[in-house]
Amino acid sequence: MMTSLGNDVLRARLQSGAEVLAPGLDAAQIDRLMDFLALLQKWNRVYNLTALQDPQEMLTQHLLDSLAALAPLRRQLAHLAHLAHSTGLAGPGQGAGPRRLLDVGSGAGLPGVVFAICCPQLDVHCVDSVGKKAAFIGQVALQLRLRNLHGVHARVETLTTPFEIICCRAFAALPDFVRWTRSALRAPDGVWLALKGKHPGAEIAALPADVQVFHVERLTVPGLAAERCIVWLRPAALA
């Protein structure tokens, strides 16, 4: 059980990290991130959602690690909005409607829950083949009143509903990731976002010819010395 002082320390660390990684978050969003951390600790005792037990480690390695991807995600969303405006596209997720993001192998909801809290314009679906993990996402959406967050109990390769962005974190090698999710990627402007540790050169080399890596972006996570990066991919036909 976290003491009030312990929560104050965690909140201060979260606030400090958010100011660096995700400028512009308001107090309500910080509150929701803290509430998510509390739910993660509570449910983890029963459901074993993460190997981490210490809330300080959860904050750094889960919340801040996910927040590190927020600025790149926002840039991609801005690019999609510009593309839709310049081409006059008005398909699903275009125009005034929300963008659809699929978080694959979401587990404890990372980074999907963080994205849903910080990007209300996103409609986030967290898919996991383990029912209790999908149920946890549903509970988070209910308790935090996140109408843009959905837990999906399914195998990702069975999904065919289109998404503009498909992301993963510690899920699978890049060739498997794109192969299992290709049917759910929306044309013509859909992209994959893979959160990785070290630069995955061997995985990139093993990708099929019809998949293009268009950007590898290094990330810095406050309090974490380990290497982090984002690999952005798209079907090569979009190049």
Curated annotation (Swiss-Prot):
Name its cellular compartments.
Answer: Cytoplasm
Any one GO MF annotation of this record = rRNA (guanine-N7-)-methyltransferase activity
Q: Name one GO cellular component term.
A: cytosol
Top EC class per UniProt?
Answer: transferase
Q: Name one Pfam family in it.
A: GidB
Q: What is the first-listed, main subcellular location in coarse terms? A: cytoplasm
Q: Which family does it belong to?
A: Belongs to the methyltransferase superfamily. RNA methyltransferase RsmG family.
Q: What does this protein do?
A: Specifically methylates the N7 position of guanine in position 527 of 16S rRNA.
Output this protein's name. Ribosomal RNA small subunit methyltransferase G
Q: Which gene encodes it?
A: rsmG
